[in-house]
Amino acid sequence: MFKVGMINLGDKQSTIVVAMSGGVDSSAVAAMLHEQGHNVIGITLQLYDHGMAVGKKNACCAGQDIYDAKMVANKLGIPHYVLDYENKFKESVIDNFVDSYLQGETPLPCVQCNKSVKFRDLIKTARELGADKLATGHYVRKINGDNGAELHTGLDPAKDQSYFLFTTTKEQLEYLRFPLGGLTKDETRKLASKFGLEVADKPDSQDICFIPDGNYKSVINKIRPNSSESGKIIHVNGFELGEHSGIINYTIGQRRGLGIAYNEPLYVVKIDPKDNIVYVGPESALNVQEFIIRDVNWLADEIKDNEKLEVAVKIRSTRPPRLAEISKLGDDKMKVKFLCEEKAVAPGQACVIYAGERVLGGGWITREIR
């Protein structure tokens, strides 16, 4: 059985901002740090029109979540601020999400939010408040290596969130703290119960926070009207099979909902936004040997030009790591080559690179896929 005293940041008494979402994880972090004698300041971000989601269960950053965060702060007796980040969130996350779908990609808004809002902007705010550190409820670990802070997976594989934090910079990592990285979710809930927090049994968020009903297509059509223009569905062998209802309705690897009859199962293999074409083919057509990633954030020692490094990579948060070989292509691109072919590599998703439990870096999957 773990003890609260065993979970500490290794820091002297400090002023620490805690990013409080209203869920059990960040609430437990705030309570833990407060008990350890730190000067804790809670901050909750209002990221979108939460009126859309009031009363919606299992959605992050809804009106109920803001209320829950404030109630936890009141119970602990710590200052708590709600910051209006709606405009920043729309520009950095929602607009990016919509544009990514219109470009035939499969976006990952949680990573964009962590990068552009929760870390970049919130760290700036925490510094302005005079805080020494920013703590979050993410299930990852920060380990001090020979060359500075390193990002590592959470000890509980079922809750590890390192895939979503690959854009964290070295400078940000030095300022951040992740007290839950060595715990399981059950241990976190027990910790919250120990502190008497009402959110101890609150369900985890499941939906994309700004899509409380799960209907992302309605959000896209609201922001970009007439975005569901129909077009051709073409077999990878070159013949036309039918008509699609708009490329926003399709993603790489999709099988259901194609609306076409054929003598074998067909999958979405490629999406061409320029010519508004959805390409389909047999499952074997999904096999990928190599691809290019862009906007690489690298957290390890620099890779030399023409150097090849054998690593493990994840191309979806729910998939296990696969062995691959990476090489540098200029300042912000890399080539990733699987040792064994992988299926359904989707542009717009993240490719996160690991050496054991350490996150070396990552980037965004481009259409340069072979």
Curated annotation (Swiss-Prot):
Residues 159-161 are annotated as: Interaction with tRNA. It is found in: Cytoplasm. It catalyses: S-sulfanyl-L-cysteinyl-[protein] + uridine(34) in tRNA + AH2 + ATP = 2-thiouridine(34) in tRNA + L-cysteinyl-[protein] + A + AMP + diphosphate + H(+). Disulfide bonds join 113-209. One of its GO terms (cellular component) is cytoplasm. One of its GO terms (molecular function) is tRNA-uridine 2-sulfurtransferase activity. Keywords: ATP-binding, Cytoplasm, Disulfide bond, Nucleotide-binding, RNA-binding, Transferase, tRNA processing, tRNA-binding. It comes from the Bacteria. Its EC number is 2.8.1.13. ATP binds at residues 19-26, 45, 137. Belongs to the MnmA/TRMU family. InterPro entries: MnmA-like, MnmA-like_C, MnmA-like_central, MnmA-like_central_sf, Rossmann-like_a/b/a_fold. Catalyzes the 2-thiolation of uridine at the wobble position (U34) of tRNA, leading to the formation of s(2)U34. The keyword Cell division does not apply. GO terms for biological process: tRNA wobble position uridine thiolation. This is tRNA-specific 2-thiouridylase MnmA. Pfam families: tRNA_Me_trans, tRNA_Me_trans_C, tRNA_Me_trans_M.
